[in-house]
Structure formats: C-alpha cells, structure tokens
Amino acid sequence: EMPVVQDISPIFKSLKELLDSYLALPQIDKNRIYIIGLSMGGMGTYDMAIRFPEVFAAAIPICGTVHPIRLANAKGVRFRIFHGDADNVVTVEGSRMAYRALKAAGADVEYIEFPGCGHDSWTPAFNYPGFMDWLFSQKKK
C-alpha cells in the first residue's frame, strides 16, 4: 500500500525548481503544462499533480499507483489514466482506485484499461487513438 503522507524527495524538489525556471520564461504557456509518467514515473506523475495542482492542466499516469486519499488535492487537474489488467509489477487496482477517488472528488478523469496487457501498458497508451490530440487540447480550468 502506498503511503498517505510523504515528504517531498530531494529529486522532486529539484524537479520542481527546474519546472519553475521554465515557467518563469515568457514564451511558456502556463495554461498548458502537462505531466506524463510510466511505472514509477506514473507514481511521480500522481505525486507532482497532488503537490502542485496549480501548475498542471493535465496528467497522464501510465501503470502507476498512489494512495487514493491523496488525490482530492489534484481534482482540478484533468487526468487520463492507463493501465494493463495483467500488470504483475504495479497492480492495476491502484489505477482503478485512483480513478474512483478522482471521480468522487469531482475531477475530470478518464480511465483506460487494456485487457491482457502486462506492465508495458505505455505501448498501447502512446498508440491510443487521439493520445496527443487529447493532451494538447487541455488547458487549465
């Protein structure tokens, strides 16, 4: 089970500092900041969206997981969650619970599960029809 409360790691602190340096540039559209991650990066995607929901217009965690109680803080971020139902590395139930928690919080969330797909659900996710069109059409609410 994922922890409910976690201090921000030094790596994530550095990542946020890097992100902030880009956000300070005038040519960056601050209404179109997206985050995508797979496996442990999917967990990081959830974590960053939870910690800094004001930054992201959309998040795409692929085969990640998170403690669902933490997700209420990210309800203003649009989510598209992908997972394979045969994943034996990161349990699919984590994505299912995340979807239900986001839905209950009133988030704009979509969940796509790939039957028979193992841990490499990023392959069908990145090939999902309209993947990039959906992402690039998202703007902060």
Listing of model-derived features with the role each one plays in the protein:
Residues 2-8, 86-88, 121:
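Second-shell loop/turn segments in exported
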Residues 2-40, 55:
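Gly/Ser-rich "nucleophile elbow"/oxyanion-hole loop immediately N-terminal to the catalytic nucleophile
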Residues 18, 46, 63-72, 93, ...:
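Alpha-helical scaffolding within the catalytic cores
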Residues 28, 40-41, 72-75, 104-105:
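Extracellular/periplasmic catalytic domains that process cell-envelope and extracellular macromolecules
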Residues 35-37, 62, 82:
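Short beta-strand immediately N-terminal to the catalytic nucleophile in serine-hydrolase-like folds
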Residues 42-53:
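Short glycine-enriched nucleophile-adjacent loop
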Residues 54-65:
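A conserved short beta-strand
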Residues 78-82, 88-141:
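C-terminal catalytic histidine-bearing segment of alpha/beta-hydrolase fold enzymes
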